[in-house]
UniProtKB/Swiss-Prot annotation:
Database matches in CDD domains: M20_Acy1_YkuR-like
Record EC number: 3.5.1.47
Protein name (database record): N-acetyldiaminopimelate deacetylase
Gene3D superfamilies with a match to the protein in the record: 3.30.70.360, Zn peptidases
Family as reported in the entry's similarity comment: Belongs to the peptidase M20A family. N-acetyldiaminopimelate deacetylase subfamily.
Organism: Brevibacillus brevis (strain 47 / JCM 6285 / NBRC 100599)
Length: 377
């Protein structure tokens, strides 16, 4: 096994980013690679555009799972790569290409080196939306190979290569999409008194929504309401009949999520009355928090500090990031950690270029951890 192989795999995958539950080329690429591995100890199942691979251990006491995401993002790539995306308007801007290369590296390692416990590798589609974790967990394929513990990583542009970060307990927030549609009465710009202007109504609602965090959420708690898109109107001299707001809600507690949604609904009702319009609210896709099981995470962090001279561990703070891996952790003990890839551009940026040296770091670290974990009672 050579690390350059998995760098090339990452580059191949980088060229074929696909939307959630449409990762057809990605799935086929992964299956083609899996077929080249020694088949004696592995079983392969497909689920929609995802893949489950079970690898038999020598004396299994448990089933240890590793999960990677697969999908790309609707972003026009602006990197300097010679291996830029071949799918116009889509890009691997969140590191899922690296995540998959690392997963294949781990799987390959354990086809060449024995391990006591059984391993399960989950190639999960649709992390960016509409969410693949929960339906995968509900599948018959997953039920037959339900793991005893589960782990994952995510690239982190802000950390240097060779550095990882995590913490016990809450790591990522609860998230919910937010879509609000307002419908009033359009008309000629010269006669505003004969129309109900949804540009004004939508703008008013945006400012009202910003009061939720400052005036309704405990200052010692954390929450975010962001409106990322406001769309209204057709021409400069036409009063807009419709307005659409698109945004996101993020909280660390489910209580705060419920409170934020309640306040949104109250404010929207106020806009309906105040601007004589009709409104609908859609919360779209929502993910539960990523909660790292305390004991497993603490033991992992201690193991890294004591056994891994080539990796630096940082105890990080919670982040408002959303990740549907949280659904796995809601029912199965495990954790997620950040993997340093040192790049000036952040996640979901069109110019992000993660340092590929991190692939080798991750494969080496996790393979050693799994070997150690499988030796524990």
């Amino acid at each position: 096994m050579t690390t350059s192989l998995f760098t090339q795999i990452r580059r191949d995958l980088h060229q074929i980013p696909e939307p959630g539950f449409a990762e057809v080329k990605t799935q086929q690429y992964l299956l083609d690679y899996l077929k080249k591995l020694p088949q004696e100890r592995i079983e392969i199942k497909t689920w929609r555009t995802g893949i489950l691979v079970k690898l038999a251990g020598t004396k299994p006491k448990r089933l240890i799972a590793w999960r990677t995401d697969m999908d790309g993002l609707p972003i026009v790539e602006e990197t300097s790569y010679p291996f830029r995306s071949l799918h116009e308007g889509y890009m691997h801007a969140c590191g899922h290409d690296m995540h998959m290369a690392i997963a294949l590296g781990l799987l390959t390692h354990f086809t060449e080196h024995s391990i006591a416990d059984d391993l399960l590798f989950l190639f999960q589609p649709a992390e960016e939306g509409p969410g693949g974790a929960w339906p995968m967990m509900e599948s018959e394929e997953f039920a037959e190979w339900r793991p005893d513990c589960i782990f994952a990583l995510h690239i982190a542009p802000e950390y240097p290569v060779g550095q990882i970060a995590t913490k016990p307990g809450i790591l990522f927030a609860n998230t919910s999409e937010l879509y609000i549609d307002l419908v009033g009465k359009g008309g000629h710009a010269a006669f505003p008194h004969k129309a109900n202007d949804m540009v004004v109504a939508g703008s008013h609602l945006v400012t009202q929504l910003q009061s939720i965090i400052s005036r309704n959420i405990d200052p010692l708690d954390s929450a975010v309401v962001t409106i990322g898109k406001l769309e209204s109107g057709t021409k400069q001299n036409i009063i807009a009949e419709k307005s659409r707001l698109e945004g996101t809600i993020r909280t660390f507690s489910m209580e705060s999520m419920a409170l934020v949604k309640s306040r949104i609904e109250s404010l929207v009702k106020g806009v309906e009355i105040g601007f004589d319009c009709q409104a609908t609210i859609d919360y779209g896709v929502g993910y539960c928090q990523v909660y790292n099981e305390e004991q497993l995470t603490t033991d992992f962090m201690q193991w890294v500090q004591e056994q891994c001279d080539d990796v630096t561990l940082i105890t990080c703070k919670e982040a408002m990031t959303g990740e549907d891996f949280g659904y796995f952790l809601k029912e199965i003990p495990g954790f997620l950690f950040w993997l340093g890839v040192q790049t000036p551009y952040g996640l979901h940026h069109s110019k992000i270029e993660p340092n590929e040296d991190a692939i080798e770091v991750a494969i080496r670290l996790v393979s050693r951890y799994f070997t150690w974990l499988s030796q524990q009672e």
